Amino acid sequence: MEKETEAKVLLVDDEQEFLETLSSRLELRGLKVSAVTSGEQAITEAKQQDFDAIIVDLSMPGIDGLETLKRIKADNPNAEIIMLTGHASVQSGIEAMKLGAGDFLQKPVELSELMEKIGEAKDKKMLVLQKQSQEELRKILQSKSW
């Protein structure tokens, strides 16, 4: 991902050390990062702010990653969510993708790969927003009989 556009990212992981390290590394690359340690906090943050990508750990106490994914997608179907896990299984990845995750990566994640996925998520979000704007404009023009 190039530095021309700063992405806004929400990191969700119950492992505090991992969360702090990844946050710092992403911020050094020009991203604006919010970090939380639970699914509950992630759901609240996702309602209050608009993120280009939400990176969620699959295995967390309380509300796990899949439930966090479901609840965020219920509130914001266009949210771009990347799932992370230290215990990846093909079945978990399939389930996350069925629930609307844009991608699924295994820890330890390569920073370059994560940056690429964040860039893709931001690009996809921008395309969705452009399409929605075009559709709204089309409806306005039709209502005015232009």
Range-by-range predicted roles:
Residues 35-44, 65:
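Helix N-cap/capping motif at the beta->alpha junctions
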Residues 57:
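Active-site residues of response regulator receiver
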